[in-house]
């Protein structure tokens, strides 16, 4: 449009100039005709060049609107990484507050008085209400069917020692109302490798002695319902004098979720690398729905006789603690500030040098 207007104006100006010039030629016939022809051609060339320059200037001064839209979107995309990292930092702050509430809830539950699992508090009715509650279980350990979970290491005075967690069935005491009404599995704590070897030797010797005694004097005692699941007889009144009853204070726990780097359990060879409660219960001849309890103590003395139970404070620890969430949030916020600053510097107009 601007180009056509410039051409029209140029033509009108040229015509006016021609008219005025022809009038001047007629008025002054002394100048030759060759001079006026050269003069007219120069004027025409200058007018055409000026119109072309005007058209190009008008076309370059008006960029397409699509380029403006594209530049706005590209500018917004530069700030997108900063917005994402800022959101991740805020999410870590929220997770930190949630972790504080979870750990506080667990601490309050663990500080409550232990619940006695006896005839008044059967296990099958209170499992959902016993989350992170200490329970008191009275019974007799069946040492011959202990399971060793490991290897597990512990550090004492900077020295690392390998060992195992020993898991033993705790059997009810017949006729005792304070005793449990069904057997459970108890994680009694950590033992060294040498303790495991000695325990297995003594268990084998005791098993042979029991088999010989059983062959000489068969028992006519009535069988309990869990006798059908058990590989060895249930504890009877005659065994109570030889085996001392114990009372375990622990917390009901579930199985573990192993990572891809943990080997699979092999019950046939007695190799257990992670807690699988149903499989362990089957291995010792108990029902698959047997309860698994971890023996816990406050302020555990590491020099006490084996097994060494778990410290109760380990139950209120998590793989990611609140301090870790705070560190993650600081990292994300720092990254957000860095990428936002780089985007600002990229869009900031540079001063023109003269």
Swiss-Prot record:
Function: Probably involved in the biogenesis of the COX complex.
Classification via PROSITE patterns: SURF1 (PS50895)
Keyword Transmembrane helix: yes
A GO term from the CC aspect: mitochondrial inner membrane
Protein name per the record: Surfeit locus protein 1
Protein source organism: Arabidopsis thaliana
Domain of life: Eukaryota
Keyword Transmembrane helix: yes
Membrane topology: Multi-pass membrane protein
Gene Ontology biological process terms from the UniProt entry: embryo development ending in seed dormancy
Entry keywords, A to Z: Membrane, Mitochondrion, Mitochondrion inner membrane, Transmembrane, Transmembrane helix
Predominant location category: mitochondrion
Coiled-coil ranges from the UniProt annotation: none
Similarity field: Belongs to the SURF1 (TC 3.D.4.8) family.
Annotated transmembrane regions: 76-92, 328-344
Protein location: Mitochondrion inner membrane
């Amino acid at each position: 449009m601007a180009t056509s207007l410039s051409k029209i104006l140029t033509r009108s100006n040229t015509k006016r100039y021609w008219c005025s010039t022809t009038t001047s030629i007629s008025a002054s016939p002394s100048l030759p005709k060759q001079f006026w022809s050269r003069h007219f051609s120069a004027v025409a060339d200058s007018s055409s060049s000026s119109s072309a320059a005007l058209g190009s200037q008008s076309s370059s001064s008006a960029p397409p609107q699509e380029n403006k839209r594209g530049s706005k979107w590209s500018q917004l995309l530069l700030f997108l990484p900063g917005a994402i990292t800022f959101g991740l930092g805020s999410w870590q702050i929220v997770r930190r507050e949630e972790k504080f509430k979870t750990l506080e809830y667990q601490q309050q539950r663990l500080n409550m008085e232990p619940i006695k699992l006896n005839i008044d508090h059967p296990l099958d009715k209170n499992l959902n209400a016993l989350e992170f509650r200490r329970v008191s279980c009275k019974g007799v350990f069946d040492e011959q069917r202990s399971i060793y979970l490991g290897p597990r290491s512990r550090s004492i005075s900077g020295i690392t020692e390998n060992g195992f967690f020993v898991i033993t069935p705790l059997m009810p005491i017949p006729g005792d109302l304070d005793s449990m009404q069904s057997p459970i599995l108890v994680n009694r704590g950590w033992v060294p490798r040498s303790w495991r070897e000695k325990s297995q030797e003594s268990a084998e010797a005791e098993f042979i002695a029991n088999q010989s005694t059983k062959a000489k004097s068969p028992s006519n005692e009535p069988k309990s319902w869990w006798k059908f699941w058990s590989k060895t007889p249930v504890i009877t009144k005659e065994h109570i004098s030889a085996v001392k009853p114990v009372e375990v204070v622990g917390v009901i726990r579930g199985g573990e979720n192993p990572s891809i780097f943990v080997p699979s359990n092999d019950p046939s060879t007695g190799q257990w690398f992670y807690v699988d409660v149903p499989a362990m219960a089957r291995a010792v001849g108990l029902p698959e729905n047997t309860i698994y309890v971890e023996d816990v103590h406050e302020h555990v003395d590491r020099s006490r006789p084996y097994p060494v139970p778990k410290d109760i404070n380990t139950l209120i620890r998590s793989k990611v603690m609140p301090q870790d969430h705070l560190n993650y949030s600081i990292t994300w916020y720092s990254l957000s500030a860095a990428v936002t600053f780089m985007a600002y510097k990229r869009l900031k107009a540079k001063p023109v040098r003269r």
